[in-house]
Swiss-Prot record:
Composition skew (Acidic residues), residue ranges: 223-252
Compartments (UniProt record): Cytoplasm
Protein name, entry field: Small ribosomal subunit protein uS2
Biased composition (Low complexity): 213-222
Subunit structure: Component of the small ribosomal subunit. Mature ribosomes consist of a small (40S) and a large (60S) subunit. The 40S subunit contains about 33 different proteins and 1 molecule of RNA (18S). The 60S subunit contains about 49 different proteins and 3 molecules of RNA (25S, 5.8S and 5S). Interacts with RPS21.
Ranges where the record places region Disordered: 213-252
GO terms for MF: structural constituent of ribosome
InterPro entries: Ribosomal_uS2 (IPR001865), Ribosomal_uS2_CS (IPR018130), Ribosomal_uS2_euk (IPR027498), Ribosomal_uS2_euk/arc (IPR005707), Ribosomal_uS2_flav_dom_sf (IPR023591)
Subcellular location, principal: cytoplasm
Gene name of this polypeptide: RPS0
High-level lineage: Eukaryota, Fungi, Dikarya, Ascomycota, Saccharomycotina
């Protein structure tokens, strides 16, 4: 698929894709994913062609931007590494997020509280989000999916080939997808204009690591306060001693 020059993959974006290990696919290859294989490494890992990843990502962004009401788009991730990315994507583009377990019947059973009638769904993994894809097929909802080389592609209309198991890879794909959607909508004036949002915002963060970081920062702040108090106490002691010496000298 040939893209207009404005949609060409830039060197910076290619470096981001490689740094996030987006190009590292599975050892097994599903028959429909064979066109996306760039080569196979000696250790058996198949390498994804990032050029084709970018082409599919731009195609998906153009489909998303063509829907007038952003709330008619549902972004789904039952995979833990993709839940933060889905929430951030929805916050920036106006889509409806489903982060965590997908409630069966959300697209087919109008009695349930979680019932939705989207015009498009985007899933992080066709395997973990299989229930959402299956229900979408019942009611003719188009599906965009982040697919690894061994992912099933049944009922998937647009597959974005990438590493959909790594937390950095998942976060980066959702980040780039959100950025391209905003550019197509005109929220970002020009493709040369950098987006103020960093890719790190879309990356999964372990709650235990966050708590540990906060505890370390709190402990560091407490230590600094104690050191400052000790310095003040020492200065006061020196001032008192100097005053006593001065008083004795005057009295003498």
């Amino acid at each position: 698929m040939s893209l207009p020059a404005t949609f060409d993959l830039t060197t910076e974006d290619a470096q981001l894709l490689l740094a996030a290990n987006t190009h590292l696919g599975a050892r097994n290859v599903q028959v429909h994913q064979e066109p996306y294989v760039f080569k196979t490494r000696p250790d058996g890992v198949n390498v994804v062609d990032v050029g084709k990843t970018w082409e599919k990502l731009v195609l998906a962004a153009r489909i998303i931007a063509a829907i007038p009401n952003p709330e008619d788009i549902v972004a789904i991730s039952s995979r833990t590494f993709g839940q933060r990315a889905v929430l951030k994507f929805s916050a920036h583009t106006g889509a409806t997020p489903i982060a965590g377990r997908f409630t069966p019947g959300s697209f087919t059973n109008y009695i349930t509280r979680s019932f939705k009638e989207p015009r498009l769904i985007i899933v992080t993994d066709p395997r973990s989000d299989a229930q959402a894809i299956k229900e979408a097929s019942y009611v003719n909802i188009p599906v965009i999916a982040l697919t690894d080389l061994d992912s099933p592609s049944e009922y998937v209309d647009v597959a974005i080939p990438c590493n959909n198991r790594g937390k950095h890879s998942i976060g980066l794909i959702w980040y780039l997808l959100a950025r391209e959607v905003l550019r197509l909508r005109g929220a970002l004036v020009d493709r040369t204009q950098p987006w103020s949002v960093m890719p790190d915002l879309y990356f999964y963060r372990n709650p235990e690591e966050i708590e540990q970081q906060v505890a370390e920062e709190t402990a560091g702040a407490a230590t600094e306060e104690e050191e400052a108090k000790e310095e003040v106490t020492e200065e006061q002691t020196e001032a008192t001693e100097w005053a006593e010496e001065t008083t004795e000298a005057v009295a003498w």
